[in-house]
């Protein structure tokens, strides 16, 4: 699955590089070529959106414990896509103003100044938004790192607990084995004592029989 994601990543990188280059060229092109270039960029932006959707689907299939890194990369790609779309909108606005000025002459100069001022304010807002997104991403990454550390600590605690349980079981088994061996040793000693007593009794009986036999003669 990760190979598919990386393949989409490479396609997305190549495509966004082409889009960036074409957006930068739009202001310097003649009117006819600009129109064609704008249409071409629109088509490539749609292809880039489709690639992002495919990458997003791939990320959703990744197990949760391995998804964090890919999710961060997806956020970065979406931010890059948003910047491309913003740059393209500016390029289209400039292109539309240029076409309109060619049709209306100097009558649109004041409107163009207002639009430039509006674009400047929009750019400031977008920079602030990007800073907020970067701060949010850092906070999310920090939270994920903390969560991973807690999970690792939890796993380590479980391992220690299992090892402790195994030691406790082994200690209990050793105690049980010791009791069994002690009982067996006690029975062996008792059996040997009985054998000695029986041997003594047999010897005494034999000696007594011999004594009676000698006295009888």
UniProtKB/Swiss-Prot annotation:
Any one GO cellular component localisation term in the record: endosome
Regions annotated as coiled coil: 31-92, 112-178
Keyword tags: Coiled coil, Golgi apparatus, Membrane, Protein transport, Transmembrane, Transmembrane helix, Transport
Entry's transmembrane regions: 193-213
Tissue expression per record: Widely expressed.
Function, as annotated: V-SNARE that mediates vesicle transport pathways through interactions with t-SNAREs on the target membrane. These interactions are proposed to mediate aspects of the specificity of vesicle trafficking and to promote fusion of the lipid bilayers. Involved in vesicular transport from the late endosomes to the trans-Golgi network. Along with VAMP7, involved in an non-conventional RAB1-dependent traffic route to the cell surface used by KCNIP1 and KCND2. May be concerned with increased secretion of cytokines associated with cellular senescence.
Family: Belongs to the VTI1 family.
Name by which UniProt lists this protein: Vesicle transport through interaction with t-SNAREs homolog 1A
Organism annotation: Mus musculus (Mouse)
Gene: Vti1a
